[in-house]
């Protein structure tokens, strides 16, 4: 984990890759829980038997939004910010789902800092580049720019 002591250190890291998270398994249970939470019960995500018969992967695949929803976990496991009281998610840019994520596969996030600027109320708005890698695949599962505002 890379720990930044203050906002100035974050700003100095603009344009750099900070690191990659550990691999995280995307289990069928996680997919089912996400489907339940979001109401997205499309069979390609939750019907294991039908997926075995009809999908090229022969298994269910994770929701693209589940893949994206792992971004905060990836960032927190790679970057530490001292003296932070809280963080609010501000938005996302340029989200692309490039490779399906089969149930049981592993993902990790490769994190870079694309931009950092002062925000109101002693905040720092940071745009993170997140490349979600799928273990065993040359293409990433997802690429996105996630924006967060950190407050001290």
Where are these regions (language model features)?
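Hot-dog-fold acyl-thioester-processing enzymes
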Residues: 1-89
């Amino acid at each position: 984990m890379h720990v930044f002591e203050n906002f100035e250190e974050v700003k100095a890291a603009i344009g750099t890759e900070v690191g990659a998270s550990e691999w995280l398994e995307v289990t069928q249970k996680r997919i089912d829980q996400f489907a339940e939470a979001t109401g997205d019960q499309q069979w390609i995500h939750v019907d294991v038997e039908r997926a075995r018969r009809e999908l090229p992967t022969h298994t269910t695949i994770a929701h693209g939004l589940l893949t994206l929803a792992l971004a905060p976990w990836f960032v927190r496991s790679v970057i530490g910010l001292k003296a932070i009281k809280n963080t609010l998610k501000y938005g996302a840019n340029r989200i692309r789902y490039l490779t399906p994520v089969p149930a049981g596969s592993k993902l990790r996030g490769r994190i870079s800092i694309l931009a950092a600027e002062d925000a109101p109320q002693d905040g720092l708005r940071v745009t993170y580049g997140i490349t979600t890698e799928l273990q065993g695949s040359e293409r990433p599962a997802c690429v996105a720019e996630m924006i967060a505002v950190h407050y001290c």
